[in-house]
Amino acid sequence: RQQLKMKVVMVRDSDVDISLNRRAEIANNNNADIFISIHVNSSYKREAKGPETFFVSLNATDKESYELAMKENESYKEIEKKVETDELKMILWNMAQADYIRESSKLAEKIQAELNILMNTRNRGVKQAPFRVLMRASMPAVLVEVGFISNLKEAKMMKKNAFYRDAAMSIFKGLKKYINK
C-alpha cells in the first residue's frame, strides 16, 4: 500500500463467501482504479499446474478457459439474465470496455510474468474468458488463479502460509511494474 501510494480495498479478510456480483460492486462503489480477484484453480486433469491470469472477453481464449469461467460463474448460483449474444450488443459492450480490456491485458501480462518466476513452472499464460466478476467491474480487472488445488504438489504447497505470501508478493510486483510502466 505504502510503496505504491494507493488505497487498497480488501473485499474480504476472512474465509467468508462474498458473491461475484458483490465483489465487483464493492470495487465499483469505491471507484477503484484496478480490480484484482485472486482464486485457486481446479481441474479434472490432475497434472494441470501453475498460475493463470485472466482478463475479460465474451469469447474465451480456449475451451478450457470457457469451461472454467462457466464453472466459476455457476458456482455462485446468482439469479441473473444470461449475457445476450446478440451481435450488436456484443459490439457495444466491447466498445464500452475497450480501454479497460487493453489495460487489463497489460496488467495480466505483468502479474503472470511474476507468478511464473515464483512457481518456476510452465507458463499457462494470460487468457481471456467471460468471468462474471470481471464483466461487472468498471475498471481494468484481472482474475488470478495462483495454482491448482487439484494438483497434489500444488495442493501441498497451498497448505503453507508462505505460498500465499509469495503469491501475494508476485501479484504486488506485477502490479508495481504495471503502474510504473
Question: Predicted regions span which residues?
Answer:
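Catalytic-core regions of hydrolytic enzymes
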Residues: 1-84, 88, 98-109, 156, ...
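Active-site-adjacent mobile loop/cap segments within catalytic or ligand-binding domains
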Residues: 93-181
